[in-house]
Amino acid sequence: MASSASSSSSPSSRPPLMALPSFYRPPWPSERGGEQRATDCWAGSPAAGGGRARATAMGIDLNNTASGGEEDAPAPGPVCRDLWHACAGPVVSLPRRGSAVVYLPQGHLSAAGAGGGIRGEVAVALPPHVACRVVDVELCADAATDEVYARLALRAEGEVFERNLHGGGIEREDDMEDGDEERKSRMLHMFCKTLTASDTSTHGGFSVPRRAAEDCFPPLDHKQLRPSQELVAKDLHGAKWRFRHIYRGQPRRHLLTTGWSSFVNKKKLVSGDAVLFLRGDDGELRLGVRRATQLKNEAIFKAFSSESSKMRTLSAVADSLKHGSVFHICYNPRATASEYVVPYWKFVKSFNHPVCIGMRFKFHFESEDVNERRSGMIAGVSEVDPIRWPGSKWRSLLVRWEDATDCNSQNRVSPWEIEIVGGSISVAHSLSASSSKRTKLCPQGNLDVPALYGNGRPDSVETEKFPRVLQGQELMGSRTHRATCSPQSIDITKSKSFDAWRFLTDTRSCMLGSSTSRLPVQYSGYTHQSVSFGESIGFPEVLQGQEISQTVPPFQGMLPDACSAKSRYELKNYVCTPATMNGLSSANEGYCLSLSTVPPSPPSSLMLYQTGVPQLELASKNNDKSGNDSQPALRQHKLLSETSWDQFKIGKASTPGNATKPGNGGREVDRTSCRLFGFSLTEKIIPTDKDGEKEVSYETDCQNPRMLDLFGYNCSTPGALHALCAAPLGI
């Protein structure tokens, strides 16, 4: 007990947690009687794994009884550069120490799964492109997955751009760590094979091509009956693997048998992965793995996965820009399709060659240890995230691949990743402004941001100088609502025009309008002209190719049902005008408003045609003596609004086709007929007055009344057409 108390009072033998019982923590070496007991206890519990731990200490592996396999890995040292590049692939290249590169924070965050920002926003204000100087390059490999990566030490330097702008020297391609020719000269004794199902089976071996075995492996003694030898190869981490190399079978072939299954199980290799052997100039054999499916690189993921680590990295970049300090990043060129550490010369070269839509390009990518090229065409130029990273060139090109393979479903590439093929493209696809004095077909402005017009829909930027020629499939509600105002001679004075415009503004609130137009009501001294024939305000417009898409902006407002009876509408030449309205003085009443004097264009066979051009007049108070006349006019207004509002044509003040019959009680009778497919829609209509008496709206002494053939019957009833037109609306 005394010894126990003395040992407990010693601060060097016990941690501060003295209140915990002994079964909550492993016993310390002083309690077990030595350092060996502590090692056995940490390796496994005495009941379940103590024997296994002691067997492991003796060099016996109970999980692998086959001879050969992995030896004890030494302390981690530098990775072989040739083996690192062989595992990385032929396309990957690293910058030299002291060379200039461009660091892209947006690409770095995207590779880490942050989508170009931290929690939806960029926490640290950084430019999209950071020019840096490479201080150090450390080649690394993940111990769990054998994925290669590099740890770069960079220092931000703004003088690199300044020297380039002032005509200084620019780093060239030889500033990379090693070129393809230099790498191939050092890797003459190397082969890479994609594993098959038999190579990854439990009891099988690894079949080596004959030429590869003779080039990389030491020669066999073929004088023996069964030639064989033992091979020792080092992996990326310096661990040694032992294999038995034999030459047998019918036909004879080279096989790696003993130790191969242990290697496959340890590395978790599957069919489709690649294994490569490399023999250096010193004769030492090295072994590497290149997986078909990229596994998560734990070393990089832990270093740049949490929000705090990302904040520290971005803050270090900001400090380097401000104070010139060194910051470190882990760079895995195989983890992302677009690099975020680009050589400076390649970055500047992409800026010197402008990119246009429609250009063809070649793209380098890796496939089964070969450097293949794919062709494509540039379909668009836009920033991935213009809000958080404005002006970024990272993955700014939208591409369309020409072959079936779309390069891992990658529809965006960076300008420095492609090689432009040819320079001739269509003028309509060019993004750069032409220097010609002729009218440019390419609009000026940002083509990537849609423009919102008055109709409330996004629309592409289009020049206003060229009239559109429609083919019949466009709707009037898309872009034709933007009426073109041309200065013309106005028939009335400026003051009268202002009052007329006020009347037009008040009238728009009660007339049937289009829900697609949201143009603000503003006064303008110009008149609106409509080149198309009498078409509906709310219906699609079908042009034949010769009309110019300049239409009157539609009236917007309430439906006809929303108009109260107190307004007392009158029908005059197919236009309803309120007898009394707000905003129009009595002195100005009775004036005529002429908004269009352009004659209609030739009609279409599919549209309604109006023989006369109606007018829009301001009714005076003298014409509104009683409210009895408003009921037939309102009924006729409902009839005409159901059949077609296409007959509204804001035209001249007087039309020869309109006349007033004195024998009808002062009511104006319009002889202009509205026809649908050749049949009259307005003749022989007998409206009913309020007092029950029937009165003919048109000439009752018509010598040749028209007979309307409906559904195969000759109908002579004057009200048949009225009943047919009014039936859908319940009139």
UniProtKB/Swiss-Prot annotation:
GO BP: any one term: regulation of DNA-templated transcription
DNA-binding region: 191-293
Compositional bias of kind Low complexity: 1-22
Function: Auxin response factors (ARFs) are transcriptional factors that bind specifically to the DNA sequence 5'-TGTCTC-3' found in the auxin-responsive promoter elements (AuxREs).
Name of the protein described by the UniProt record: Auxin response factor 3
CDD domains: B3_DNA
Membership in a protein family: Belongs to the ARF family.
Organ and tissue specificity: Expressed in roots, culms, leaves and young panicles.
Region of interest (Disordered), residue spans: 1-41
Originating gene: ARF3
One GO term describing the cellular component: nucleus
Pfam family, one: ARF_AD
Subcellular localization, as worded in the UniProt entry: Nucleus
Keywords: Auxin signaling pathway, DNA-binding, Nucleus, Transcription, Transcription regulation
